[in-house]
Structure formats: C-alpha cells, structure tokens
Amino acid sequence: MTDLNKHIKQAQTQRKQLLEESRELHREKLLVQAENRFFLEYLTNKTEEYTEQPEKVWNSYLQKSGEIERRRQESASRYAEQISVLKTALLQKENIQSSLKRKLQAMRDIAILKEKQEKEIQTLQEETKKVQAETASKTREVQAQLLQEKRLLEKQLSEPDRRLLGKRKRRELNMKAQALKLAAKRFIFEYSCGINRENQQFKKELLQLIEQAQKLTATQSHLENRKQQLQQEQWYLESLIQARQRLQGSHNQCLNRQDVPKTTPSLPQGTKSRINPK
C-alpha cells in the first residue's frame, strides 16, 4: 500500500511536471507560431513587392519610351517643317537670283549702250564745236567779202570822174550796194538761224543722251545693290540650314544617350502574364 501510494505520488509528480512541460511547450509553440506568422507576412509582402517591381520598371520604361518617342516625333516634325520653309525661301531666293542674272545681263547690254551713247555725246559735242568754229569762220569770210565789195563800190562812187557818170549809173550802183547789203544781212541772218537750229537740236539730243546715261547709271547701281543683298540673304539661309542640321544631329545624339535600353527588356514570366494574360 505504501509502495502504491509512493508510486501514485511519483506519478502525480511526473504528471504535474509533464503538464508544466506541456504548457511550456505550448507557450513556445504559440511564440514560434507568432514569429512564423510575422516572418511569413514579411516574406509575403517582400515577395509581392519584388514581384510587382519588374512590372513597375516595365511600365516606367514604356512611359519614358513613349515620352521620348513623342518628343522625337515632335522634333522631327518641327525640323521637317522648318526645313520645308527654308527650302521654299531658298527656292524663292534662287528664282530672284536667276531673275537678277537676267537683269545683270540686260545691265551689261545697257552698259554697252551707255558707252555707245557717251561716244555719241562726245561726237556731238565735237561736231557742235566744229560747226560753231566753221560758222564763225564763214561769217568772218562773208563779212570780209561784203566789206571789200562795199569799199569797192564806195571807191567807185567817190572817184573824181563820178561827175562823168550819169545819174542812172549812180542809181544802179547805189541800188546794187543796197541789194548787196541786204543780201549779206539776209545770208548772215539765215545762216545764223540755221546754225542756231542745229545747235538747239544738238543740245536737245545731248540732253536726252545725258538723261538716258544717268538713268542707266542709276539702274546699274540699283541692280548691283540688289545683287549684293540677295547674295547676303542666300548666304544667311544656307548658314541657317547648316546650323539647324547640326542642331538636329546634336539633339538626336542626346536622345540616343538617354537611359533607355536599346533593346526591349525581357520581363519575368509572371509579370508578362500579369500584363498580357494571353
């Protein structure tokens, strides 16, 4: 009986120890389960985060690629439009330059005509001086001849034997002298009028030629200035086109150097299926 009680007590003591150990194990189990849940949640969150990260990177890549492509297309469109405008302006300037070349050719013809007119002006001036000199010489000759004839008639009328001449003879001589004077005056008058008319005509032609020469000179100067202006405008347009081409080349290089992969990055299988279920 005593042994039985002893065994019962031992069994109760062992049972109590086992219960205590069982409770301790249960507490440790709960603690481990709590820690496991925490790590499981942490791992789950990290797994979802890492799983979503490639998709975010891919979406960011697509967005940046689309933005870069849009900017590239806008730049290309602006560049093409500017080039078109510049080409149109350059074509207009080439047409103007072609027209200017034709005008310059006409200007050369005008210069030749101007040189010819200047020679004609010089010839007319020389002829005018020559005619004036000849007129003065002939006038002096006629005056000398008339003066000589007048003196001869006066001598004949004043000779001592004039009493021997009849009244009729004297009247004839007087009439002849008067007629000679009138003829001389008429000749001188008509000759002077003719010379004056020729001089007036020469002056008129000379003024016309001088006026034409002045107009030709003004036209030539205007065409030369216009030619220089068009050459400067053409040089400016060509420089502007070259500058825009260099600027576009630099812009394209900047776009190519941006942090965008040249090839489409491959996504994880799970991300691809999430983006495109097909």
Swiss-Prot record:
Taxonomic source organism: Homo sapiens
Keywords, sorted A to Z: Coiled coil
Coiled-coil annotated residue ranges, if any: 1-30, 105-243
Cross-referenced Pfam families: DUF4515
The protein's name in its UniProt record: Coiled-coil domain-containing protein 121
Annotated spans, Disordered: 253-278
Alphabetical list of InterPro entries matching this protein: DUF4515
